């Protein structure tokens, strides 16, 4: 299989809900169109930002199918298939219809806190179970365990279909170590909007973005400029969004970006429990910043 290269700005797509708690599939397709029309380079479907743990198997299958049909090959689809049970991920890869999926995203197992050898064996089993490109996802703030640079590089060297890592450890030194020592066919992708610009200057190839749900045109332009070496103009855009970066996660993800999308009139401000909407004080701060940026409110 030809190796997919996920470069530029990917968006970790949210799942819009109606007031009755059902999935708003019409709003979902509008959001996909919004991304396609505004420079998004690839979509990350059914990741953390999609509130995937709260979705049923039927809902996940329908969301995947609708998005793949709407995108119709125009940009790559990165599908989240994470679980803290290795066997469950392997069975998903073997049994689910992966037509239209370009690569899969798999987080380090959460809650059961495996050792570095356990993490390696988890990804080894997954890489050997599929011909699809696999993207590692290191997010210790959610999983409770950090995948070290040594483990990441071991996986990158041992398996040709492990093509990238979404790095959200917040440890720039660790990320730089991976970038400096990685094989040529392995990429580092930022998992944090706020460090996308500095990480690209070190050699990362892009971001899987949360804020890109709301601002795909602006943030994809920043990413593209940085990748082209136009750091001055990229930095100007980066600084434009600094306050919003910090507000995104004050009340948890995707509460922040859903509030932004609601202010912009694109979705209902609805999450599924145990997640709840952002506080009114945060909401009003976002509204004020969006007005200042002359974003439609």
UniProtKB/Swiss-Prot annotation:
The active site is at 137 (proton donor/acceptor), 166 (schiff-base intermediate with substrate). Pathway: Amino-acid biosynthesis; L-lysine biosynthesis via DAP pathway; (S)-tetrahydrodipicolinate from L-aspartate: step 3/4. GO terms for molecular function: 4-hydroxy-tetrahydrodipicolinate synthase activity. PROSITE patterns: DHDPS_2 (PS00666). InterPro entries: Aldolase_TIM, DapA, DapA-like, Schiff_base-form_aldolases_AS. It is found in: Cytoplasm. The record marks 48, 111 as: Part of a proton relay during catalysis. The keyword NADP does not apply. Keywords: Amino-acid biosynthesis, Cytoplasm, Diaminopimelate biosynthesis, Lyase, Lysine biosynthesis, Schiff base. It comes from the Bacteria. Pyruvate binds at residues 49, 208. SUPFAM superfamilies: Aldolase. Its EC number is 4.3.3.7. Belongs to the DapA family. Homotetramer; dimer of dimers. Catalyzes the condensation of (S)-aspartate-beta-semialdehyde [(S)-ASA] and pyruvate to 4-hydroxy-tetrahydrodipicolinate (HTPA). This is 4-hydroxy-tetrahydrodipicolinate synthase. It comes from Phocaeicola vulgatus (strain ATCC 8482 / DSM 1447 / JCM 5826 / CCUG 4940 / NBRC 14291 / NCTC 11154).
């Amino acid at each position: 299989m030809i190796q997919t290269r996920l470069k530029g700005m990917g968006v970790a797509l949210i799942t819009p809900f109606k007031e009755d708690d059902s999935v708003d599939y019409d709003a979902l397709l509008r959001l996909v169109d919004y991304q396609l029309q505004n420079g998004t380079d690839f979509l990350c479907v059914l990741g953390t930002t999609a509130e995937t743990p709260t979705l049923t198997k039927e809902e996940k299958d329908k969301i995947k199918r609708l998005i793949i049909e709407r995108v119709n090959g125009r940009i790559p689809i990165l599908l989240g298939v994470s679980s803290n049970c290795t066997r469950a991920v392997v069975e998903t890869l073997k049994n689910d219809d992966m037509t239209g999926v370009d690569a899969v995203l798999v987080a380090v197992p959460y809650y059961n806190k495996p050792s570095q050898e356990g993490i390696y064996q988890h990804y080894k089993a997954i890489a050997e179970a599929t011909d699809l490109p696999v993207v590692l996802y290191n997010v210790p703030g959610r999983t409770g365990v950090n995948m070290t640079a040594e483990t990441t590089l071991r996986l990158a060297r041992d398996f040709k279909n492990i093509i990238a890592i979404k790095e959200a450890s917040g440890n720039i030194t660790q990320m730089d170590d991976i970038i400096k020592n990685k094989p040529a066919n392995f990429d580092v992708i930022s998992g944090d909007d706020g460090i996308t610009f500095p990480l690209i200057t070190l050699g990362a190839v892009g971001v899987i973005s949360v804020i890109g749900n709301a601002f795909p045109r602006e943030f994809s332009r920043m990413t593209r400029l940085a990748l082209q070496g136009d750091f001055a103009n990229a930095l100007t855009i980066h600084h434009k969004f600094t306050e919003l970066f910090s507000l995104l996660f004050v009340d948890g993800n995707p509460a922040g970006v859903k509030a932004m999308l609601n202010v912009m009139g694109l979705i209902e401000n609805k999450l599924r429990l145990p997640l709840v909407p952002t506080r009114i004080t945060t909401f009003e701060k976002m509204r004020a910043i969006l007005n200042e940026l002359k974003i439609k409110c």
